[in-house]
Amino acid sequence: MIGYLKGNVIWKAENKVILETGGVGYRVLVPSTVRLKPVGEKLELFVYTYVREDSLDLYGFKTMEERELFETLLSVSGIGPRAAINILSSLSYKKFIEAILTEKVSILKQVSGIGPKTAKRLILELKGKLKDMSGDFEEPLPDNRNTELSDALASLGYSELEIEEALSNADIKNNGSLEENIKKALGYLGSKGS
């Protein structure tokens, strides 16, 4: 099984990349949260190898935690690799785990193809499994401050997914000023683009 690839990008398209490693090109499917490097640059991916009777597919992730979450999602009845990639493309790692642990069906239903029944099944089957993966999540910002920050980032042209990812990963503090939190979010979003 292939678990990790590091190589040069020789071709890329939306949610797909071919990495050349040791003279071999590996076609890897990735969630939209993976920022693909330009052709010719190096890229590292943690890989899940999905084997079916008639094919072998590689799914790549920027962190081992995301790869493990993908594998955990596949354990849910009715969730295949396409649905799992769709979930990880729509919600950040932390946001998804928080939605499961806090049983927020409304957040899960925002993912295309996830209705109320599937959202409830995800919560039921994953809540116990994801407690170990949850880490120490800081309490989210109060709704009004979170909304102000989201609105500010949206006015700068960032997508809902980018905003959600920045809110989850940019070391934004409850006691920080709006200006400080905007700077941190922009710093995070800027570092992802490079």
Curated annotation (Swiss-Prot):
Domain of life: Bacteria
InterPro entries, per database record: DNA_helicase_Holl-junc_RuvA_I, Hlx-hairpin-Hlx_DNA-bd_motif, NA-bd_OB-fold, RuvA, RuvA_2-like, RuvA_C, RuvA_C_sf
Main location class: cytoplasm
Pfam families, per the entry: HHH_5 (PF14520), RuvA_C (PF07499), RuvA_N (PF01330)
One GO-annotated biological process of the protein: DNA repair
Record region (Domain III): 141-194
UniProt keyword list: Cytoplasm, DNA damage, DNA recombination, DNA repair, DNA-binding
Segments passing through the bilayer: none
Alphabetized Gene3D superfamilies for the sequence: 5' to 3' exonuclease, C-terminal subdomain, Nucleic acid-binding proteins
Chain intervals for the UniProt region annotation (Flexible linker): 136-140
Compartments, record wording: Cytoplasm
Region (Domain I): 1-62
GO MF term list: ATP binding; four-way junction DNA binding; four-way junction helicase activity
Cellular component GO terms, alphabetical: cytoplasm; Holliday junction helicase complex; Holliday junction resolvase complex
Stretches for region Domain II: 63-136
Function: The RuvA-RuvB-RuvC complex processes Holliday junction (HJ) DNA during genetic recombination and DNA repair, while the RuvA-RuvB complex plays an important role in the rescue of blocked DNA replication forks via replication fork reversal (RFR). RuvA specifically binds to HJ cruciform DNA, conferring on it an open structure. The RuvB hexamer acts as an ATP-dependent pump, pulling dsDNA into and through the RuvAB complex. HJ branch migration allows RuvC to scan DNA until it finds its consensus sequence, where it cleaves and resolves the cruciform DNA.
UniProt subunit comment: Homotetramer. Forms an RuvA(8)-RuvB(12)-Holliday junction (HJ) complex. HJ DNA is sandwiched between 2 RuvA tetramers; dsDNA enters through RuvA and exits via RuvB. An RuvB hexamer assembles on each DNA strand where it exits the tetramer. Each RuvB hexamer is contacted by two RuvA subunits (via domain III) on 2 adjacent RuvB subunits; this complex drives branch migration. In the full resolvosome a probable DNA-RuvA(4)-RuvB(12)-RuvC(2) complex forms which resolves the HJ.
Family stated for the protein in its record: Belongs to the RuvA family.
Domain notes: Has three domains with a flexible linker between the domains II and III and assumes an 'L' shape. Domain III is highly mobile and contacts RuvB.
Protein name: Holliday junction branch migration complex subunit RuvA
Gene for this chain: ruvA
